[in-house]
Amino acid sequence: MTRISRSAYAEIYGPTVVGGVGDRVRLADTLLLAEVEKDHTIFGEEVKFGGGKVIRDGMGQSQRLATDCVDTVITNALIIDAVTGIVKADIGIKDGLISGIGKAGNPDTQPGVTIIIGASTEVVAGEGLIVTAGAIDTHIHFICPQQIEEALATGTTTMIGGGTGPATGSLATTSTSGPWHMAAMLQALDTFPVNVGLFGKGSSSSHGALLEQVRAGAMGLKIHEDWASTPASIDTCLNVAEETDIQVAIHSDTLNESGFVEDTFAAFKGRTIHSFHTEGAGGGHAPDIIRAAGMPNVLPASTNPTMPFTRNTIDEHLDMVMVCHHLDPSIAEDLAFAESRIRRETIAAEDILHDLGAFSIMSSDSQAMGRVGEIVLRTWQTAHKMKLQRGPLQGDSERSDNERIKRYIAKYTINPAVAHGIAHLVGSVEVGKLADLVLWKPAFFGVKVNMVLKSGMAVSASIGDMGASISTPQPVQIRPMWGSHGKALRTSVAFVSQVSLSNPAVSELGLNKRLEAVRGCRGVTKHDMVRNNWLPAISVDPQTYQVYADGQLLRCEALAELPMAQRYFLF
């Protein structure tokens, strides 16, 4: 029997499991170590493409017709996923969907084949690469279209939010107001290779004014204090949501003008709602909106500028608040409004509540107190900070951090998908879902993508000089690929409400994107948030702003230095 050393095997085929012990992979330059839990491939029967390799006719490639074979296979990849786990496998893609996670090859010559390779199969070499589900950003201000290229370059494949461009309302609030703007933005977003969904303006006590936006194609409604986040508007908005099975997102009343946090909670009446930037620096009842993270009907999210807590976090927030919410620093009341939202104690507690699974979702708040290209990066910086300050999570050890890794990746993949009724199509690396997949070199994990697949077709990738003789010479840049051009845009989805699908005005928009209705939004609770469903009793001292969870004070220090930072961005 021919033998190969473990290190040599990993170099050729990627990490594996031997004798029940998995190889480990460091994520970027963090302290986080992922250990392979299972290897679906078979030793000695691995498939690999290239000169003198296995995927050749009569060897690893069968003579089967296209109907029996996958369109694309990713070979020997390390999957990191909140649902599937941390596993080594071949991934089959057929008709834009993940069709298999297992062992690829030729069943006529190899044992255990579950993914058939044929003449109609393209190969993506996954050896030594990490594969994750595309990130889902549920807090997008659609201010400028260039955000989408930035998002794709950092692994985001689904963008949900609102706006109409750099209008003053859109600079502050994530809502696309009214049927006319809804139609225009759906048509504008039709030319980009990402899944999209739009929020209508939910700040109204008029049932009809909200319903007409849902019928026009809104996949959800957004309540925002700048338009009014009153108990009446909250109740009306949730009534419409219950009737139409859509999600409601809320940015509550920082100034406590129309009531305190208890009044907002009472207006929920136990109904499901997605709470944006639940810590409060991004907006919400001062100083105690963070209490929402302990409610079973609230799906609590963070936006990325407060994550993780560093020595620069407090200083940068004041200017962000002033600009985003159209405030005047020469007006004392405006300055007091901004300062009321920025609290060192609640920002520090936010890191810990994420680590313990009380906060369930991460998002960006793009160009409106958040960075569209940093949702993935800041999630892992936070996980690193928490390991550094708090040690291993329960179930982890000094050897590996699988439980923490699966908890944190859920925050920008499966949990936002579940919250907004789109988990039947996106959010995890599972059979039957869209092949919206991101490939990473481990050293660049969470920072710079190797390749982004949209329904199995490359839409963004790190590619060298296009005038060179090969694809690798410098400058290597993340560039748009064929999947982002022409009618290949049909590989993306526009998520809308179910009631809008029967509206002739929506079907007459002539969209290339496939229209898919959100579903199951109203039955979701905090218990459905994968690996992030802790429900502590949270309290905030009104004088000191100190945060307690189940009676325990939550405190951590600001970091002065982070991984995944300057060493990756010299150019």
Curated annotation (Swiss-Prot):
Pathway: Nitrogen metabolism; urea degradation; CO(2) and NH(3) from urea (urease route): step 1/1. It comes from the Bacteria. It catalyses: urea + 2 H2O + H(+) = hydrogencarbonate + 2 NH4(+). It is an enzyme of class 3 (hydrolase). Ni(2+) 1 binds at H139, H141, K222, D365. The active site is at H325 (proton donor). Its EC number is 3.5.1.5. Carboxylation allows a single lysine to coordinate two nickel ions. Belongs to the metallo-dependent hydrolases superfamily. Urease alpha subunit family. Heterotrimer of UreA (gamma), UreB (beta) and UreC (alpha) subunits. Three heterotrimers associate to form the active enzyme. This is Urease subunit alpha. It comes from Bordetella bronchiseptica (strain ATCC BAA-588 / NCTC 13252 / RB50). The gene is ureC.
